[in-house]
Amino acid sequence: MPPRNNPAANHDRRSVLTLLAATAAATAIDAVVPTPLHADPNPDWTTPLPPFRIAGNLHYVGSRDLASYLVTTSSGHILINSNLLSSPAQIRASIEKLGFRWKELKFLLISHAHYDHCAGSAQILRETGAKYMVMEGDVPVVESGGKADFQYGRRAEFLYPPAKVDRILHDRDRVSLGDVNLFARKTAGHTKGCTTWTMTLRDGGKLYVAVIVGSPNVNPGYNLIHDPKYPQMAADYAAGFHTLKSLPCDLFLGAHGLYFDMLAKYQKLKTASTNSFVDPTGYRDYVADCEQAFAKELAKQRAHPLRVRD
C-alpha cells in the first residue's frame, strides 16, 4: 500500500473510500424501505452494459453494477453470478453478443447467496443444463430460495426460486473445465459461504492473476457479536480478510462494479494502451478500507451491543 503521506496515494485512497461508501449504499439491502418482491432499487442493477473481454478468456456479461463473468474454455464455459430474477435474459444476450452459445454453459458459480447475485440461477440451470457449484454455508440458502439466510430469510422481498446444488465447494477447491482452473476461496461473513474466485489467465503473452471479490462488506443491521443464527460472524469476517490480504492480485474484480470502479475502467479500456483492470494497488486499498470499516463496526457493537433478534 502506498505511504499515507503521499499526495497521489491519499487521492487514490479517498477515491477508494468514496467507492466504499457508494458500495455500502448499493449493497445495504436491508437498509432500504421494504420493496415489492424482486423490485430492483438501483437502476444500474438492471441497465445493460455492452459485454466486453476483460483479459484473455475472461469476459464481462453483467449489468452496469451487478457483475457477471463468463470464462470461456475449450470444453464449454463457466458463468459466475446469475444476478437478479430478471437478469438471465440480459446475461444470455451479452454472452451471445460475444459470439458464444448459451447452451455451452457447463458450470454456474456465484459470489454469494444474496438475491442480487443468485436469484436467476434456477432459470439458467433449467435452460442450459449447467452444474451448480456453491460454497458450503451458502448451500442451504440457495436450496431454500433464500429462506435459510441468517439476515434476510424472513423477508419475502429478498427470496428467490430455489435451485439444487450439484457440487458443494470448500475453501481452496478447484473448479476445472477444459484448460481452465478457478479456485474458490471462502471469505465468509457477508454470507456464510461468501466466495472470492481466483484464476490465472494469459493475455498478450503475459500471465495475470484475476481476483473476483465476493463481498467483504458489513451490511447495516448485521449483529457481528450476538447473532444466534450466525454466532461466528465476526470470526469469519476476520478470517476472510486474512485470506483476501494473502491473495496475489493483478486484475481486480468483484461482485459489484462499484467495488473496483468498473464503469471508469471500462471507459479507459477502450483507449488505454494498458489494461485498466490491472489494479493491484486498488485491490489492496479496497480490502484495507473494508477491513477498517469492519473493525470500526465491531468496536462500536462491543461498546453498544445490538439487540438480539428473536
Predicted features, each with a name:
Residues 86-89, 96-174, 271-272, 278, ...:
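Active-site HxH/HxHxD metal-binding segment of metal-dependent hydrolases
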Residues 44-98, 102-104, 196-218:
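Conserved beta-strand hairpin/beta-sheet module of binuclear metal-dependent hydrolase folds
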Residues 57, 71, 81, 112, ...:
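Divalent metal-coordination and catalytic microenvironments
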Residues 87, 113-119, 139-142, 192-195, ...:
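Active-site environment of divalent metal-dependent phosphoester hydrolases
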Residues 80-82, 106-113, 133-135, 187-188, ...:
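Active-site neighborhood of phospho(di)ester-bond hydrolases with catalytic His/Asp-centered motifs
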Residues 2-27:
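N-terminal secretory signal peptides and thylakoid transit peptides that target proteins
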Residues 199, 204-206, 218, 229-309:
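Divalent-metal (often Zn2+) His-rich catalytic cores of metallo-beta-lactamase-fold enzymes
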Residues 38-40, 48, 53-55, 104, ...:
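Metallo-beta-lactamase
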